[in-house]
Swiss-Prot record:
Involved in mercury resistance. Acts as a mercury scavenger that specifically binds to a mercuric ion in the periplasm and probably passes it to the cytoplasmic mercuric reductase MerA via the mercuric transport protein MerT. Monomer. Hg(2+) binds at C33, C36. Belongs to the MerP family. Its main location: periplasm. The keyword Protease does not apply. Residues 1-19 form the signal peptide. Keywords: Mercuric resistance, Mercury, Metal-binding, Periplasm, Plasmid, Signal, Transposable element. PROSITE patterns: HMA_1, HMA_2. This is Mercuric transport protein periplasmic component. GO terms for cellular component: periplasmic space. It comes from Shigella flexneri. It is found in: Periplasm. The gene is merP.
Length: 91
């Protein structure tokens, strides 16, 4: 029983090490006016785990920094699509 608790304690202590901050650039071609980036930024900022969002109208892209244990690229692209701006990972 003691070994079980020791193993669980070790796993809990190491778990935060596996978390990683990711940065992804999303292409958002549907942004056609200067107000569009505001909507896209709000949508992405609401995704749990997102720590930073920079949206550029000129390049029609969003650079998003997020905790990959709480958010994913799929959640980010869903958030923009739900806001009316489909996006994809920029290559």
């Amino acid at each position: 029983m003691k070994k079980l608790f020791a193993s669980l304690a070790l796993a809990a202590a190491v778990a935060p090490v596996w978390a990683a901050t990711q940065t992804v650039t999303l292409a958002v071609p549907g942004m056609t006016c200067a107000a569009c980036p505001i909507t896209v930024k709000k949508a992405l900022s609401k995704v749990e785990g997102v720590s930073k969002v920079d949206v550029g109208f000129e390049k029609r892209e969003a650079v998003v920094t997020f905790d990959d244990t709480k958010a994913s690229v799929q959640k980010l692209t869903k958030a923009t699509a739900d806001a009316g701006y489909p996006s994809s990972v920029k290559q």
